[in-house]
């Protein structure tokens, strides 16, 4: 399964790890299909680390109103450049917030802690142009 993340800075094409992290991918795609992410901002941007979005409050404090379990035992659980991962406040507290890694340099400590559920395969340059407050225009799921 694939996703197209349309932002005000360009489009990122993402391969989703639906075989490895089925519950996380289902949650993400369900929210995307409902338009949950449309118009939300990247509220947290840390250079050489990651860009984070998916908070309906725009502050990092919101979510969809429920939590999902982590799926961190799959094979593709390395936070490399372009990897899409679920943000959370502790084990099994993810919901809608996600982050995309800038590089492997500062992310190894996240392996096995946060669920990696996809990777940007095209439009990787967009990651580097995103700034705090930039918008997710829409996320299109391609099955």
Which positions does each model-derived feature cover?
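Cyclophilin-like peptidyl-prolyl cis-trans isomerases
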Residues: 1-143
